Amino acid sequence: HIDPWKGFDSKLNFSPDVKMEYLFSDSYIIYAHANGGRENRSLREIAALTPYWYLKGSEYLPTYVSLDAAAGFKASPADGLWLHLAGGYQIRENDLCVNLMSKSAYMFAGLDRAKTKAAYGSAEAKYEYKDIFSLSVGAAYYSWSADGEEENYLLALKPELELNLYAEGKVAGGLRVGAGYDYVKRCSKTYHDVSNLYAKASYALRDGLELFAKGRNLLGSEYCDANAYPVQGLNVLVGAAFRF
């Protein structure tokens, strides 16, 4: 990629765009890729992430991924079973880093920018039995670094370890229920780790109409999400969906 940019920091950015895959035995894939590119976010999109934000500095610069390299292995050794192992390395210029900061008498999600680097490894497994039952489990580990003297501040809300588990099944007729658990260990001990137990149920009626109910944070944990948005107490959503 060759990306020209004009604005507060006019420059030409370069990033690779290479992808390779090898399929063998019809059920196994080895792949590798190296790419990148610009991630533009308008101020409206930032406000959609969290309404409590404060931009440090007078200008907003888009994030540029100068390298996103990864290699992995995908397999389906049995009917309904999928496995995925991957590892990679990223370099992000003007990466949007979020942290809580105090301004006057209020707390804001402070948005800052820095060049960050991350090496990561992940593993995922999923099993499906017809349309009756499905189970997925995944884990990822990240090793972050950032340029500058405020590395701990910039990386505070970045994930160090992510774990997730989800199961869903068909109970009877059009009724389906599911439950899962998400855990995220932050790079900084300043913030509570994400601990989100959630559940959902849906009932399919005729002609594409579906009723659903979702509940998250069933354990009543208190933590901030990746955008410093506070999560407190039980959250419940009930509604209907129509497909046409």
Label for each model-derived stretch:
Residues 3, 7-15, 19-244:
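Exposed, low-structure sequence patches enriched in small/polar residues
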